From Swiss-Prot:
Gene name of the record: gH
InterPro entries, sorted: Herpes_gH, Herpes_glycoH_C, Herpes_glycoH_C_sf
Family of this protein: Belongs to the herpesviridae glycoprotein H family.
UniProt main location, coarse: virion
Record's function text: The heterodimer glycoprotein H-glycoprotein L is required for the fusion of viral and plasma membranes leading to virus entry into the host cell. Following initial binding to host receptor, membrane fusion is mediated by the fusion machinery composed of gB and the heterodimer gH/gL. May also be involved in the fusion between the virion envelope and the outer nuclear membrane during virion morphogenesis. In human cytomegalovirus, forms two distincts complexes to mediate viral entry, a trimer and a pentamer at the surface of the virion envelope.
Signal peptide range in chain numbering: 1-23
Name by which UniProt lists this protein: Envelope glycoprotein H
Pfam families listed in its UniProt record: Herpes_glycoH_C (PF17488), Herpes_glycop_H (PF02489)
Any one of the GO CC terms: host cell endosome membrane
Transmembrane segments: 720-740
Topological type in the membrane: Single-pass type I membrane protein
Length: 742
């Protein structure tokens, strides 16, 4: 509720109180009432006035002197120093100071403050005009809208890629459901707290308002970024040590009230058509926040229509986040991370304003926007929070309701990309129990399609975007383990040396629109064996590109901090080098250079002295158990030929290793087509070399050496395909002869 006239009178009274003279000289006087207040100029002649009921004094009133009673039962006096022996005296009705609200305000004013302390306080905080001198105003028109229109995905798919349609089982359509959804409240987080903001702050009166808090603690309790979101504004609090934190306050700010002698104008750093940015920082902290003096500080966040949520995410948050990630500034508090945190808070603020547009939005577009909001929250936690994170996740009940209702409506979610976002929203809102198995099955099939599409080509920006979302799903759910294991092995198989090399080249490009442009499947995969030291060993004669350390830094930042969603892998120490391969529903392989986990191990004998390679097979239903001791071992069988009959070699992994350097590449082969592709000599996946060997890790727990294998492609399926192809060729030839004779 906004304060009424009585509240504003109380605020006025408090402001007058804060001007109260701290010297020993005071006076009290009354005159004729003017709008329930009294105003006199009083001469004291160098003596204090005693506050007695019948005390009188000589007052100047209309250029004449007269004696007047200075005490009234229904009034409280305020005395302000004008000049030597002269004070301005105000009377305010006593009733304004009764009640808890008045008590709250009065408790925030130090009536015993000395003049010296008052003057010291004047010089404590930085003023924009004096200490920062970087004020800027922006005149762009602000309007809640969506520049992507009805585009169902942020990054559109390539023209030549067919997007699978979603099959949904027959269900009952909820009553009142429509194919479009109003934007009202859709992207507004639940305000589940009542906050007392600015409590105890030197400059601001506290205010009570519905809000939500979100904190990102970098190292300890002293280094953090906090976001406080209210209906009208947000606050970014930046703390570097135990001193008073810096505050960035942005929005519609009539309820942000300053204590005297300060005014809002003293602290306005940026100003737009509808909103203001206040910065409150102590002068002795300016050396740590010197970026506040930069004239382009926050330009990328405020110099366009930031109420356009899609444009804001692209032009502001993703721009800042990409810069932070490429420069390795996560877990640091500097200009880059502060701008990113501000852009994140601004995105939450703008998303809540979407309801002002009052427009209808399609379900796919609404799901994409909501998934984008949750994805930037996930990145903020990944980049800024300590491990394990303590950040409170924001809840979006209206968006969750939309996702649930869409699941009940046949043919409402038409393509797989919308289903990916719907499931992502439910998983990130702690609604895993609502995700049906058929939904994750189709998402896993989509991951396999991307895998097959990019077996012989680099990942597109669209594929990186989709794999980014699916990789997060894998590590944020406990249900539907079979489908999640399939997505996990796809991400692992796509994490090849070729992908890592291409990824480092991408980092050399100066412009990336979205965080997903910097995503590689290696971030969510089971490959934990990539390091600068290992790459240097693999390519001793090559010059390491300057972007390789940045690529490895991004991997370190983006990789999950645990594998706890997989029962047979959760105990693996993530600080050590290994590869985890979930090749099938029941079988996993862990490839290491030492004994690391309990299971059936296959020691590789064809390595040089001093090098070891151990492949351990585990059951997906067996609880992970860490061990450094030798345990059950089996020998590796040498295979000279492979038959594709019955797809016995499907759902397997092809592992390439070097005698001296260990694992080089791992390729996942889901079906017979993948096996043929891998073993076809024209594709140069398996290359004959005296130092290079190839192992096939099968879905039944068997490990084969296939370095010199011959593929028997006589299975019935391939034979039928050959017959069909030959028939098609003959048919085309006959058609050609007929047309030629006409």
């Amino acid at each position: 509720m906004r304060p009424g006239l009585p509240s504003y009178l109380i605020i006025l009274a408090v402001c007058l109180f804060s001007h109260l003279l701290s010297s020993r000289y005071g006076a009290e006087a009354v005159s004729e009432p003017l709008d329930k207040a009294f105003h006199l100029l009083l001469n004291t002649y160098g003596r204090p006035i005693r506050f007695l009921r019948e005390n009188t004094t000589q007052c100047t009133y209309n250029s004449s002197l007269r004696n007047s009673t200075v005490v009234r039962e229904n009034a409280i006096s305020f005395n302000f120093f004008q000049s030597y022996n002269q004070y301005y005296v105000f009377h305010m009705p006593r009733c304004l100071f009764a009640g808890p609200l008045a008590e709250q305000f009065l408790n925030q004013v130090d009536l015993t403050e000395t003049l010296e302390r008052y003057q010291q306080r004047l010089n404590t905080y930085a003023l924009v005009s004096k200490d920062l001198a970087s004020y800027r105003s922006f005149s762009q028109q602000l309007k809640a809208q969506d520049s992507l229109g009805e585009q169902p995905t942020t990054v559109p798919p390539p023209i030549d890629l067919s997007i699978p349609h979603v099959w949904m089982p027959p269900q009952t359509t909820p009553h009142g459901w429509t194919e479009s959804h109003t934007t009202s409240g859709l992207h507004r987080p639940h305000f589940n707290q009542t906050c007392i903001l600015f409590d105890g702050h030197d400059l601001l009166f506290s205010t009570v308002t519905p809000c939500l808090h979100q904190g990102f603690y970098l190292i300890d309790e002293l280094r953090y970024v906090k976001i406080t979101l209210t209906e009208d504004f947000f606050v970014v609090t930046v703390s570097i040590d135990d001193d008073t934190p810096m505050l960035l306050i942005f929005g519609h700010l009539p309820r942000v009230l300053f204590k005297a002698p300060y005014q809002r104008d003293n602290f306005i750093l940026r100003q737009t058509e509808k909103h203001e940015l206040l910065v409150l920082v102590k002068k002795d902290q300016l050396n740590r926040h010197s970026y506040l003096k930069d004239p382009d500080f926050l330009d990328a966040a405020l110099d366009f229509n930031y109420l356009d949520l899609s444009a804001l995410l692209r032009n502001s948050f993703h721009r800042y986040a990409v810069d932070v990630l490429k420069s390795g500034r996560c877990q640091m508090l500097d200009r880059r991370t502060v701008e990113m945190a501000f852009a994140y808070a601004l995105a939450l603020f703008a998303a809540a304003r979407q309801e002002e547009a009052g427009a209808q939005v399609s379900v796919p577009r609404a799901l994409d926007r909501q998934a984008a909001l949750l994805q930037i929250q996930e990145f903020m936690i990944t980049c800024l929070s300590q491990t394990p994170p303590r950040t409170t996740l924001l809840l979006y009940p209206t968006a969750v309701d939309l996702a649930k209702r869409a699941l009940w409506t046949p043919n409402q979610i038409t393509d797989i990309t919308s289903l990916v976002r719907l499931v992502y929203i439910l998983s990130k809102q702690n609604q895993q129990h609502l995700i049906p198995q058929w939904a994750l099955r189709q998402i896993a099939d989509f991951a396999l399609k991307l895998h097959k599409t990019h077996l012989a080509s680099f990942l597109s920006a669209f594929a990186r975007q989709e794999l980014y979302l699916m990789g997060s799903l894998v590590h944020s759910m406990l249900v539907h383990t079979t489908e999640r294991r399939e997505i996990f092995i796809v991400e692992t198989g796509l994490c090849s040396l070729a992908e890592l090399s291409h990824f480092t080249q991408l980092l050399a490009h100066p412009h990336h629109e979205y965080l997903s442009d910097l995503y590689t499947p290696c971030s969510s995969s089971g490959r934990r064996d990539h390091s600068l030291e290992r790459l240097t060993r693999l390519f001793p004669d090559a010059t390491v590109p300057a972007t390789v350390p940045a690529a490895l830094s991004i991997l370190s930042t983006m990789q999950p901090s645990t594998l706890e969603t997989f029962p047979d892998l959760f105990c693996l120490p993530l600080g050590e080098s290994f590869s985890a391969l979930t090749v099938s529903e029941h079988v996993s392989y862990i490839v290491t250079n030492q004994y690391l986990i309990k299971g059936i191990s296959y020691p590789v004998s064809t390595t040089v002295v001093g090098q070891s390679l151990i492949i351990t097979q585990t059951d997906s239903q067996t609880k992970c158990e860490l061990t450094r001791n030798m345990h059950t071992t089996h020998s590796i069988t040498v295979a000279l030929n492979i038959s594709l009959e019955n797809c016995a070699f499907c759902q397997s992994a092809l592992l390439e290793y070097d005698d001296t350097q260990g694992v080089i590449n791992i390729m996942y082969m889901h079906d017979s087509d993948d096996v043929l592709f891998a073993l076809d000599p024209y594709n140069e996946v398996v290359v004959s070399s005296p130092r290079t060997h190839y192992l096939m890790l099968l879905k039944n727990g068997t490990v084969l050496e296939v370095t010199d294998v011959v593929v028997d492609a006589t299975d019935s399926r391939l034979l039928m395909m050959s017959v069909y192809a030959l028939s098609a060729i003959i048919g085309i030839y006959l058609l050609y002869r007929m047309l030629k004779t006409c």
